[in-house]
Each structure stands twice: as C-alpha cells, then as structure tokens.
C-alpha cells in the first residue's frame, strides 16, 4: 500500500481548508438584522405546514404523488428564499457550506413548528374516524428494522444527492434556464423515493414528519429510531458522494467573476447584507 508524502498531504489539506473558507461566516447578530433571514424562516414554517397537510394520506399511490407534487410547487414558490422543508436537507446545506450553523438551527426550529402545526391540522381538522382512508398515515414499520433502515436510508440518499446542486454554495447553474426545472426534478425525487418506501416504512424520509405524526398515536413509538438514523446516515453519504464527485470548475462572466446561481441563497443573501457588513463572497473565496 502506497502512502502519500508530506507535500501531497499538505496539498489535500489545503484544498479542504479552502473549501471550508468558502462557507458563510456571518454572525448571528448580522443575520437577524437582515430581512432575508426572517423571510426564510417564514418560508420554511409555511412550507412545512402545507407539505404536511398535503402528504399525510394513507393511500399508497395518492400519498407519494401528492408528496412529490406539493414539494415541487413549494420549491418553485420559495426557491429564491428557502425551500428545504426537511431538517435533513437543512443539515445537508450546512455540510455543503451553504448556510451558517445559526441559520441551520433557526430553519430546523421553523420546520419543526410548521410540521407540528400541519400534523395537528391533519388529525383534528381533516381526519374522519368514520372513514378509514381519511386518517393520516402512521409511522409504523411493515418490515424488519434493518430493512426499514435501508428504505429510509436509500430514499433520503437519492433526495439529498439530487438536491445537492441547489444546496452547494460553490455550484452554478448556466443561464440557459435549467434552474427552472430544478423544482420539478426535486419533486420527482421526493415522490419516487417516498413511493419506493411507502409500503415498508410509510415513505417519510423526514425525521420531524415521522415524529409529528407519532405524537398523536402513542402506540407507534416502537422502532421509531429508524426514522431518524436512516435519513441522517443517508444524508451524510449523499453529501460525501456529491462533495467528491462534483465538478470544480466554476462558471465565469465576461469580467472573470464567478457566477453564483439565483437558486442559491448565498448570492441573494450577500446582496442584502452588503450595505451593513464588509463580508462578501469575494472575501470568503
């Protein structure tokens, strides 16, 4: 087995540090003073609520289709602000150096509140005890825990790998208009992954979504950890896979400046922060 010499080790370490330096370093005080921060909080709260309401059906066909279509619509509506609606996706954005830890925690809290509110609407406002099909889906495993982990793991892996081009702070989208197709692609990945795992685990692929629905059915806590470790490990592997397979050549304009996509929050966010702080993407890079 060949070992790397010291110069090669230093070069690889330098590349890692350069990538980490491109992460946003805004302080919590700077972030809370910007309107885009609070807009992203509202977008995640409203989006998580609507997504929960439209994706809680027990039907094995309508449920995944509604889940994917609703996600595509919400992603299109909030694509220039924040369109995660899933704590695992927000964690992936943090690992890909697209958001700060403070913003990650804030978005997860907003998603939690929105998901819990949506679950309350499903159980107390939309469900009908006299109609079996109208009851919200329950986080119950229909397979062994190991197989349940596999379904949640691979389903989340596909979703995060698909969305990494949107979450990556160093990624770019050409001006050909391909970014308009991203919400549709995201919706397809969510719907197909949820449909794949529907019969086995319910196709939640979202720890907070499973937790919110389990709160209303106290007898459905057995093997609940599967709905947490499966998506989290799937997220970690997807981020690792994308981080080591993505193209590293950025797109540049006529002035030799890197073009960041409008679908990436860093560009829009940095523009709004410009008047109040000297931190820019140029200095971070």
From Swiss-Prot:
The keyword Transport applies. InterPro entries: Aquaporin-like, Aquaporin_transptr, MIP. A motif (NPA 1) lies at residues 86-88. It comes from the Eukaryota. GO terms for molecular function: water channel activity. Glycans are attached at residue 128. The keyword Phosphoprotein does not apply. Pfam families: MIP (PF00230). GO terms for cellular component: plasma membrane. The chain crosses the membrane at residues 36-56, 76-96, 105-125, 143-163, 177-197, 225-245. Induction: Transcript abundance is low and expression levels are not significantly affected by desiccation or rehydratation. Probable water-specific aquaporin that may modulate the water content and osmolytes during anhydrobiosis. Aquaporins contain two tandem repeats each containing three membrane-spanning domains and a pore-forming loop with the signature motif Asn-Pro-Ala (NPA). This is Aquaporin-6. It comes from Milnesium tardigradum (Water bear). The gene is AQP6.
């Amino acid at each position: 087995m060949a070992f790397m010499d010291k110069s090669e080790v230093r070069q690889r370490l330098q590349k890692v540090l350069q990538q980490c330096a491109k992460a946003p370093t805004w302080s919590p005080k700077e972030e809370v003073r910007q309107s885009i921060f609070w807009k992203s909080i509202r977008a995640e709260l409203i989006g998580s609520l609507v997504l929960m309401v439209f994706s809680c059906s027990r039907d094995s066909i309508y449920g995944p289709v509604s889940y994917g279509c609703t996600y595509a619509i919400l992603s299109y509506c909030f694509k220039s602000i924040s369109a995660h609606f899933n704590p695992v996706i927000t964690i992936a954005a943090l690992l890909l150096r697209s958001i700060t830890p403070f913003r990650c925690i804030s978005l997860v809290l907003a998603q939690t509140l929105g998901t819990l509110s949506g679950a309350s609407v499903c159980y107390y406002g939309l469900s009908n005890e006299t109609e079996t099909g109208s009851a919200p889906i329950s986080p119950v495993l229909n397979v062994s825990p190991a197989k349940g982990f596999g379904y949640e793991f691979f389903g989340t892996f596909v979703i995060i790998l698909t969305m990494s081009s949107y979450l990556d702070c160093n990624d770019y989208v050409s001006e050909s208009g391909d970014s308009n197709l991203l919400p549709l692609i995201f919706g397809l990945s969510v719907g197909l992954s949820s449909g794949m795992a529907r019969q086995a685990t319910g196709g939640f692929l979202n720890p907070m979504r499973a937790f919110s629905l389990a709160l209303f059915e106290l007898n459905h806590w057995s093997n609940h950890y599967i709905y947490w470790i499966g998506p989290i490990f799937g997220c970690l592997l997807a981020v690792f896979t994308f981080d080591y397979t993505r193209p590293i050549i950025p797109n540049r304009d006529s002035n030799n400046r890197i073009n960041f996509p409008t679908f990436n929050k860093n560009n829009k966010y940095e523009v709004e922060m410009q008047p109040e702080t000297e931190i820019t993407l140029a200095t971070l890079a």
